[in-house]
Amino acid sequence: MEAEDDERAEAEAEARREKEAGNAAYRKLYLETAVRHYTRGALLDPRDISFLTNRAAAYLLMSKYKECVRDCDEAVEKGRELRADNKLVARALARKASALLKLAACAADYDPAIRALQQSLAEHYSEETLAKLGEAEEARKEIEERERLDQEAADHHRDRGNDFFKQKRYQEAAMHYTEAMKKNPKDPRVFSNRAQCHIYLGALPEGLEDADKCIALDPTFLKGYLRKAKVQLLMGNYEIALATYVEGLKCDPNNLEVLDGLRRCAACIKRANGGDSRAEDLREILGDLHLNDDLCNKLQKSMDEAAVLKKEASDERLKRIESERLARTLEDLYLSQVQQRKETEESLSRVQQEFEQLKIQQDEVTVELQRVNEQNENLLGQLSDSREHFEWLLSEHDQLLRERDNAVREVEELRQKRGQMLSVLVTAMHCEFSSSEVESATENFSNSLKIGEGGFGCVYKGILRNMTVAIKVLRPDSLQGQSQFEQEVSILSRVRHPHLVTLLGACSESSTLVYEFLPNGSLEDFLMCSDKRQTLTWQARIRIIAEICSALIFLHKNKPHPVVHGDLKPANILLGVNLVSKLSDFGISRLLIQSSTNNTTLYRTMHPVGTPLYMDPEFLSTGELTPQSDVYSFGIVVLRLLTGKPPVGIKNIVEDAMEKGDLNSVIDTSVGEWPHLHIEQLAYLALRCTELSRRCRPDLSGEVWAIVEAIRDAALSSPSSSRSAQDQNSPPSYFICPISQDIMDDPHIAADGFTYEAEAIRSWLCNGHDTSPMTNLLLEHEELIPNRALRSAIQEWLQQHSMSL
């Protein structure tokens, strides 16, 4: 006995420890852990119902309301059996009520929760429980009131639907029946009525669905069977319709409409089987339906009558039946394309309005029967016209679909041809790099090598075939990025100029462009950084203005088609070692085509792109891109070089200063004292370039170049610019052959990746050398690849410096 007491005491102590652990987990909201502790405690001490009430509280927070109710019921039953404290029982009932309230909010049934709260109050009075009871009763009243209002609304919509149905306005009637269903989805009459509307509208599948719902709600409602059988009969399912009519007979064996439906089904079955049937045949068909002989006799009589009617039917009757079937088919097709054919819907709506107007006139003028008949004939003619119009629309729709498919196919073919042409163009004009070479050069597109990022891709610095290059990786999944890739290759493959960035090659597989690397970044970097801006002397700025002007003139005079840059701004003007400027970023540039209406060249687009502060206002408003668009951007760039200020409102600032005669107040004097004459000439020229009207802007190759060239020559003749001129005469290191140490005339790439003069490397190989002149490593092969891009760059450099000399 003492051993049992010791075991019980030990179990109770262990249960208390489990309760404390569960309470601690509950306070920290570790609800699953709390449930496990309470469960073990309940097993150790079954007489303590607090384990059940505590676990119910955890389940309540976990939204496991059914488990909460189960634990509360068990706690109440065990508490009453053990005569536990009424407070514990009341607490269990209150938590049960809380769970039931949560369930009631979803199921809209507050009665179980109210009963639980009333029982809790009976066990132990609590203000909190009383308040919950009041809230539950108020919620129940709200639900009852809402149900009453919903029922009234449902009755109202059903009555309105009946009115429209009597007026043969079946579409409006179906809409009101639908609203009635939303308010009271358990009324079989509404489903039956809407099924009849669907039948008249030709929506047979929807009518069959509504009839099935009507029967499911009330299997004794005869009209549901009538609607379902009628739909099945119209759909040609005669045997199924016959079985449905037989089910309807169980509701009313003497209903004439059901008997008439049975006769029609029997006639249809007989026609489908190609002959008359006897009473024995009818009993065999209906054998599984357990019908009596009297009903079979009635059906046989109906079939005999149908046979007589069949013999009397004329060819015209058969044609009319076929026409009605065709009309139903057309109506079904119309309903399936309502959303796609709004014009057809409007036309049919007008026809329905005419129907309604004719109906009103018919009700008001009943004595004029002849007139109403004539109007009905006119209406039938209009309906026939609308059907013909509908058929025409269908044929037009099919034609448009075919044209669309042809257009898509042509676009795809053009895209393939364009890609092939682009591939040939890249192969002919530049080196084609592989994706692996690009990934290796950028260290798998490392962020540490990223030197720029734009809307269509990123720019990386890398070493490619032992040359420091700039690699622009465009987004291949972007249409804009692909367009920019094709545009830049197309433009830079056609034009060459000392002040246009050199395209060394491309990787069409990854939409990557490889340019010469210009170490000093962009002109925007210098203008935005105060330290760098001071290194950009006024002589250098004038030289940059002249270089950009000459590059634009070259593009605009390109043959056979002029080129417009379209996005000229300091960020797209790159600077080399000696601050030699080069235009870049030809992604939105365009080749201009001669207009057929006037003697101008332009490019027209519905979606102008570029940098708004530098864009031609007329290009923004009309979408027409011309060389004068670059003139406007050039004027803004000149103003920025003069003032060092941001582009926002820069034109107004300079204009105001010139009107006040205080132009020096806005000039950037941090780079030295500008010659006053140069300032006025450049400011006046820039303001003319930024005129709102294109016609008022000067021509770059005429007046602008004459002024800019004179200012440049005067600026470069100053002593401070002589040193930079000497630096510019030195050729870049990668123009020098590693073997001959002279500027290369015919550069070729060897197997080691280095570029040599063709004659020098061939002589090296012919003398028996099989190693690299640069790395002394064994060459894999002796094949040489012409470096056309480098050769073109060398020729441009030589041409430029021969002209300057």
Curated annotation (Swiss-Prot):
Disulfide partners: none
Lineage of producing organism: Eukaryota, Viridiplantae, Streptophyta, Embryophyta, Tracheophyta
Residue runs in coiled coils: 341-417
TPR repeat start-end pairs: 15-48, 49-82, 90-127, 129-153, 154-187, 189-221, 222-255
UniProt keywords, alphabetically: ATP-binding, Coiled coil, Kinase, Nucleotide-binding, Repeat, Serine/threonine-protein kinase, TPR repeat, Transferase, Ubl conjugation pathway
Enzyme Commission number, as recorded: 2.3.2.27, 2.7.11.-
Entry-linked SUPFAM superfamilies: Protein kinase-like (PK-like), RING/U-box, TPR-like
The protein's name: U-box domain-containing protein 70
Task of the protein: Functions as an E3 ubiquitin ligase. Is recruited by MODD to promote ubiquitination of BZIP46, a positive regulator of abscisic acid (ABA) signaling and drought stress tolerance.
Binding site for ATP: 451-459, 472
Top EC class, one word: transferase
SMART domains: S_TKc (SM00220), TPR (SM00028), Ubox (SM00504)
Top-level taxon of the source organism: Eukaryota
GO terms, biological process: protein ubiquitination
Region (Disordered): 136-160
Pathway annotation: Protein modification; protein ubiquitination
Limits of the Protein kinase domain: 445-711
Active site: 567
Record has Cell membrane as a keyword: no
Pfam families: Pkinase, U-box
Annotated catalysed reactions: L-seryl-[protein] + ATP = O-phospho-L-seryl-[protein] + ADP + H(+); L-threonyl-[protein] + ATP = O-phospho-L-threonyl-[protein] + ADP + H(+); S-ubiquitinyl-[E2 ubiquitin-conjugating enzyme]-L-cysteine + [acceptor protein]-L-lysine = [E2 ubiquitin-conjugating enzyme]-L-cysteine + N(6)-ubiquitinyl-[acceptor protein]-L-lysine
Classification via InterPro entries: Kinase-like_dom_sf (IPR011009), Prot_kinase_dom (IPR000719), Protein_kinase_ATP_BS (IPR017441), Ser/Thr_kinase_AS (IPR008271), TPR-like_helical_dom_sf (IPR011990), TPR_rpt (IPR019734), U-box_ubiquitin_ligases (IPR051348), Ubox_domain (IPR003613)
All copies of domain U-box, residue ranges: 730-804
An example molecular function term from Gene Ontology annotations: ATP binding
Protein family: Belongs to the protein kinase superfamily. Ser/Thr protein kinase family.
Subunit structure, as described in the record: Interacts with MODD.
